[in-house]
């Protein structure tokens, strides 16, 4: 097996491998860091390369922490019936991974989100690493693997749900029975003239 396969196997069930001790030590530092932090190299090199990462100019990796669980809704200041408060059991229509991608895109407005992957979680938050690409960098424009990002059709792809996590949340990973109303989008379905 190659080195990447060993890393992949270890990350499949982190609790049963050496990754558990590594993560325990890492998370103590991660909790003290800002919510969006650029890092020098990916934590999971196998997953990053699988999703399109290359160690070259114009590509950076950012680690983002996002809260776990349901949405943190503010409590209304004026009186309301307890039944209509709308605080608990409110969940986002977006996945936490998609929220992480959008926050990374907001912090780096000149870059586009290529992909992202999970790196850890504790009782309060989850951490994702986001691969960002600068579409205007010459090394990106001249690389056929990434030049499609420079065409202009992919601006703000994280906010438009065009990343892998975004498409999954929009129901576009599935086809056939049960996915009839997912295309071209949930809101756009049925608007087309016959």
Curated annotation (Swiss-Prot):
Keyword annotations from UniProtKB, A to Z: Ribonucleoprotein, Ribosomal protein
UniProt entry tagged with the keyword Ubl conjugation: no
Keyword Nucleotidyltransferase attached: no
Name used for this protein in its record: Large ribosomal subunit protein eL15
GO-annotated molecular function: RNA binding; structural constituent of ribosome
Listed PROSITE patterns: RIBOSOMAL_L15E
Annotated spans, Disordered: 158-194
GO biological process annotation, one example: cytoplasmic translation
């Amino acid at each position: 097996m190659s080195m990447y396969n060993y890393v992949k196997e270890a990350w499949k069930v982190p609790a049963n491998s050496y990754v558990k001790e590594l993560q325990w030590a890492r998370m103590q530092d991660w909790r003290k860091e800002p919510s969006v932090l650029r890092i020098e190299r990916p934590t999971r090199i196998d997953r990053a390369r699988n999703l399109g990462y290359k160690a070259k100019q114009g590509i950076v990796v950012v680690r983002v922490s996002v809260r776990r669980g349901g949405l943190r809704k503010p409590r209304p200041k004026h009186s309301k019936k307890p039944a209509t408060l709308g605080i608990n059991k409110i969940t986002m229509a977006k996945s936490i991974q998609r929220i992480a991608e959008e926050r990374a895109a907001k912090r780096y407005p000149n870059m586009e989100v290529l992909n992202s992957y999970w790196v850890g979680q504790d009782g309060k938050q989850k951490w994702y690493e986001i691969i960002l690409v600068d579409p205007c960098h010459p090394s990106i424009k001249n690389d056929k693997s990434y030049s499609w990002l420079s065409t202009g059709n992919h601006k703000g792809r994280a906010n438009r749900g065009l990343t892998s996590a975004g498409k999954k949340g929009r129901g576009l990973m599935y086809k056939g029975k049960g996915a009839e109303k997912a295309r071209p989008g949930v809101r756009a379905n049925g608007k087309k003239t016959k």
